[in-house]
């Protein structure tokens, strides 16, 4: 800009000098040439000023658009990460209810439905339809502003499959309670779990899926993983099959898992992730139980869940280590017979309880 001003000044000075010079040296051609040069410089200066104004307006608009985009994006993601304890408060404030022999589905409005089948299949649709074992049992009114929760309570000896309204599939193990909404809103997908579930989460990059428990939560976009969080046990765990998950405890400490990794949670504290063979942790979905160098008391705790039978173990039996694989579709008598090939034990039935005794001192 300064250069253009200097050029115009230079030409103007020459024009003034020309007027002061002798008329003999003045010709119309010279005058026209000087005037054209002045007009040319003025046009250049005007064009430059116009270009600068356009560039300024464009730059200012771009910066404003970027900041607006950042603000809106921040607002969008803040809706995910602002702590919302609605479902946790609901789950923890419910009167403890256990299912003695049948699977119980508690729907909004205190409606209780007994699901008789051992391996029931419950499906929620986006339009509000609920189907249990191919039978439509309820047509829910979808309300945009009101979040209503369901509870699925599985007794010992039973398992079920649950499909949520977004298409996420859950395999729910024995002795488990799951709290979930009839449908998910646009900003949040959350469920609450006590017990054990295996999940195949429907992928939605705009809406993370969060599994909450008493001591920790797991956040994903779409993946396959197992959560074990029985209140009666001192340890919980998360095992990742596919994708990635982020686990966060109540102290906000976070751990990220890669496929084939497990994290244990003791009293709410996250251990370091470790690589494991995932099959023993997830084979219950296929009605199998795998164990390698496991104490017998842990094996029988799992059998207590799967079959709903109470086992009383001789102290000498509790810490015996066994390895093997059990088909949980078989009768309990056959399963116990299989275990007896791995350890020196025998069984006695008394008062609807099974006593597991040692053969060593007989």
What are these regions (language model features)?
Residues 10, 62-63:
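N-terminal cationic amphipathic segment used for targeting or macromolecule association
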Residues 1-26, 360:
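Short, charge-enriched, intrinsically disordered boundary segments that mark the beginning
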Residues 21-56:
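Positively biased amphipathic helices and basic secretion/translocation or surface-docking motifs
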Residues 9-12, 31, 35, 278:
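Alpha-helix initiation and N-capping motif
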Residues 12-19, 35, 66, 75:
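Gram-positive cell-envelope targeting signals
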Residues 5-8, 24-27, 31, 47, ...:
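Intrinsic-disorder-associated interaction segments
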Residues 46, 50-60, 69-360:
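A residue-level detector for the "anchor" residue at the start of short, highly conserved motifs
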């Amino acid at each position: 800009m300064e250069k253009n001003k200097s050029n115009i000044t230079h030409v103007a000075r020459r024009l003034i000098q020309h007027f002061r010079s002798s008329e003999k040296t003045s010709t119309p051609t010279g005058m026209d040439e000087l005037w054209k040069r002045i007009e040319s410089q003025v046009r250049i200066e005007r064009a430059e000023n116009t270009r600068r104004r356009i560039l300024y307006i464009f730059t200012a608009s771009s910066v404003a658009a970027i900041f607006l985009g950042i603000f809106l994006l921040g607002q969008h993601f803040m809706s995910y990460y602002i702590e919302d304890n609605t479902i946790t408060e609901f789950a923890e404030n419910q009167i403890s209810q256990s299912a003695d022999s049948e699977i119980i589905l508690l729907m909004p409005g205190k409606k209780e439905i007994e699901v008789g089948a051992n391996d029931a299949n419950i499906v929620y649709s986006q339009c509000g339809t609920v189907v249990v074992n191919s039978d439509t049992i309820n047509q829910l009114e979808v309300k945009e502003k009101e979040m209503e929760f369901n509870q699925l309570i599985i007794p010992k000896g039973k398992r079920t499959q649950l499909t949520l309204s977004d298409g996420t599939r859950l395999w729910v193990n024995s002795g488990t309670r799951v709290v979930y909404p009839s449908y998910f809103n646009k900003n949040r997908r959350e469920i609450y779990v006590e017990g054990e579930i295996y999940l195949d989460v429907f992928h939605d990059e705009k809406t993370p899926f969060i599994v909450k428990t008493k001591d920790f939560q797991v956040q994903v976009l779409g993946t396959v993983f197992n959560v074990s969080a029985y209140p009666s046990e001192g340890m919980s765990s998360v095992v990742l099959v596919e994708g990635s998950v982020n686990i966060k405890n109540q102290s906000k400490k976070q751990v990220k898992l890669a496929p084939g990794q497990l994290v244990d949670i003791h009293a709410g504290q996250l251990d370091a992730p470790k690589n494991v063979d995932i099959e023993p942790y997830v084979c219950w979905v296929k009605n199998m139980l795998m164990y390698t160098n496991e104490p017998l008391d842990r094996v029988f705790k799992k059998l207590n869940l799967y079959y709903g039978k109470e086992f009383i173990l001789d102290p000498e039996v509790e810490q015996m280590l066994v390895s093997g694989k059990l088909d949980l579709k078989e009768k309990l008598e056959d399963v116990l017979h299989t275990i007896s090939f791995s350890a020196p034990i025998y069984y006695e039935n008394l008062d609807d309880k099974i006593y597991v005794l040692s053969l060593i001192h007989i």
